[in-house]
């Protein structure tokens, strides 16, 4: 026990010295060795035994992750490392590299200031590497590079030192190209990684060794020594001469920023409040004496403690018994236990000051992404997720008495993972669960069975489509049921540039805090500034503009109009699927002076029917989600793979050969991708490795659209015939 207590005492001492803290993550493409690297860093820091590390995968502590060998939840661990005679506290957050868990990656990025990007020396920079690096840079997280699996270059590919150098240079060039492309303007050059200064290290996480130029200079170990030891199979000496954790954690301490440095440039970017307010200044300076503010990045369900929220403390000190506000959910809560994580184990502390990663209980109903503070401050920006839910399954409890338990379990899952959408269909009593892909949903359903011991019936997966329009509609009048309120609106397709800016988070969703700034941005993207000034709301990639002049009572009903706009966007006119890329403009209105005659029961149907009728007059179309598929396969199976893709309405985008392996990149509709895993394994005798990414939405071909609309409507218990304009527009 002595060692563990020593460790905790050391961590407590370092927590109060922000210049000695590094909050960092490890991000990579799936199977490039991220979790193995994390475990060996922990072993080096004395958290687990060295022999076990790498085989043990401490951070993959969910039994499902261990079975699948992929990291599903971002766990975090605090450890201590000595660099040039000083101790440093390193808070490590492990993030998943599998695309179906992209939401976890984005949230973890919010809590950290720096990241080790892991790239497999054999495979090089892969699409998912680009995705995680882009997310890191967008959250102002500084990267360093670890080139992994170098042992394979020596043993399997038998490369000469010269060829290896060329490999490394290619990886570094590719990573720097991405940093130049995605880094914030002021860091495009400063954050490039370089071999000379030690912001690049290379090695083998599995065999627990690593090298960097500063380490080679300091110790005299040469690259040739490494090749000889690897070929001789003398792994013990190798680990002693070039210990992974020393090289990598030295790089972390030297090149990644401490919270004092990082918060100065990260807070103005991540937080929309007034930087000169007392909270703003406290966060900029990472001040432990300021008002306590933290952002929740993850909710974990602990068997003993209930919901544990982990997050980053930006200012002040988190203490037991503190009364706090949950800003987004507009509630108060009281903090109960305060602690930190060492792997799956939570260790209680009396207080955790600014600049640290904390684990607290007592924040009932907090979601990942929640801002928690002792004052009512502006929330941190909504987190951007790179993909949106595209696949839905309907779930029913086999046993009726399990229903309350099922509702609770689904609520909990949605809370832990905001990229999972749960909807209860009141009419059929089914629960609809939407996620980012087949694997994402499989994992969640598995948890219902194992953690909640629930027996559920699951429908075959259903694809979530989107509805949109192709041209501008004429002005349409929407009347309230009592005929006392009239709204005159048009709808039109949203230009791609504007839609992209909303998806990328450059234009925030929701009611704009600063409409002028948003209007200016819209004007830069080609919208007429006079029209853009009317911006009222952005909702799921759709926009509501008020282009009226001096209408009486309009302000009083604006909230209701926005709610009605949301209802119309949640269920479009064709098949009650969500709407995307539509701009709704209000041109004129007549509103009853007595608020009794202009309540929700009057306003909602008026605006909803007007929007739906206008959409029917604007060339309504159906969009379907696409997936990008990246397949690594031996050369001889190439034909089988492209046939498999073609049968699924897919197309090949790119093919390149790396050694014996072909990398095939294709795109196909999600609807055609179910069962792809089995089919591709069969077609390639199990030799294909593949990952998928969300590739946005594309228009459904006309010949298929009618048939799909029929199927969706039938499934929802509606009249299966696709509606015509006269069915949706009220007859005048």
Swiss-Prot record:
Its main location: cytoplasm. GTP binds at residues 28-35, 94-98, 148-151. One of its GO terms (biological process) is translational elongation. Pfam families: EFG_C (PF00679), EFG_III (PF14492), EFG_IV (PF03764), GTP_EFTU (PF00009), GTP_EFTU_D2 (PF03144). Gene3D superfamilies: 3.30.230.10, 3.30.70.240, Elongation Factor G (Translational Gtpase), domain 3, P-loop containing nucleotide triphosphate hydrolases, Translation factors. One of its GO terms (cellular component) is ribonucleoprotein complex. The modification Diphthamide is found at residue 597. GO terms for molecular function: GTP binding; GTPase activity; translation elongation factor activity. Residues 19-260 form the tr-type G domain. Keywords: Cytoplasm, Elongation factor, GTP-binding, Nucleotide-binding, Protein biosynthesis. The keyword DNA damage does not apply. It is found in: Cytoplasm. It comes from the Archaea. InterPro entries: EFG_II, EFG_III/V, EFG_V-like, EFTu-like_2, G_TR_CS, P-loop_NTPase, Ribosomal_Su5_D2-typ_SF, Ribsml_uS5_D2-typ_fold_subgr. Catalyzes the GTP-dependent ribosomal translocation step during translation elongation. During this step, the ribosome changes from the pre-translocational (PRE) to the post-translocational (POST) state as the newly formed A-site-bound peptidyl-tRNA and P-site-bound deacylated tRNA move to the P and E sites, respectively. Catalyzes the coordinated movement of the two tRNA molecules, the mRNA and conformational changes in the ribosome. HAMAP family: EF_G_EF_2_A (MF_00054_A). PANTHER family: ELONGATION FACTOR-LIKE GTPASE 1 (PTHR42908:SF3), TRANSLATION ELONGATION FACTOR-RELATED (PTHR42908). Belongs to the TRAFAC class translation factor GTPase superfamily. Classic translation factor GTPase family. EF-G/EF-2 subfamily. This is Elongation factor 2.
